[in-house]
Amino acid sequence: MPQNSISAQLSNLHQLVADLEAIENGGKKAISNTIKDVKARAPGWIAQEVTAVYNIKKSEITPSGSGKPKKMAGSIQITGETIEELAITYKGRLLTPVHFGMTPKAPPRGKSYTLKAQVLKGQKKVIGRYLNTRTTGGPFSQRSHNILMGTGNTKSDGTSWIPFQRMSKTRTDIKKLTTISVPQMITSDRTNEAIMLRLNTETSKRLEHHMKRALGL
C-alpha cells in the first residue's frame, strides 16, 4: 500500500509539472505574440489619439502600407523585446500650417488675403494677413508681413505654396512659418494622458487574448 500510494503521488506530480510547463510555455508565447502585436498596432493607436485632438491626417503620421511611400510629417516606432522594455520613439520636424488645413492654399493674384489654419480641431485661427499695398516689390515689399511663397513643386500631391514671415524691414529677412511637430503633439498635455491610457488598455486586451488562446480557454 505505501508503495502504491507513493507511485500515485509521483504520477500526479509528473502531470502537474507537465501542466505547469505547458502553462509556462503558453505564457511565454502569449507574451511574445503580445509584443509583436503592440509593435505593429501601437503607432496606429497613438495616431488615433493625436488626430482626435489635432487637425492632422492619420496618414501623415503612420504609413498606410499600400501605394507608393510619401514624405511623412513624422514617425512613431515601438522598440523592446519584453513588455517592460517597450519604448516609444517618435521623430518629426516642425510643420508648416499647410498640414493643418491652411487657407488659402495659393495666393489670389493681385488681392489681399488672410491666412488661416486649424491646428487644434474646431479652432480655426488667423495666422497672418497679407495686404496688397500695390507698392514697389509687390508681395515681397517691406510692408508685406506674411506671404505665401512658391516651393517650385511640380507634383500633383506636393506642396506648391508655404507661408513665410517677415522678420525685419530687410527684404530678404524672411523665415518659414511653422507650428508644431509630431513629437510635441504626442507629449502634449492635451494628448499624453489619453495615449498612455490607450496603450495600457490595448496592451492588456492583447495579452488577455493571447493567454486565452495559448491555454485553450
Set out the residue ranges of the language-model regions:
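Short, Lys/Arg-rich flexible segments
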Residues: 1-217
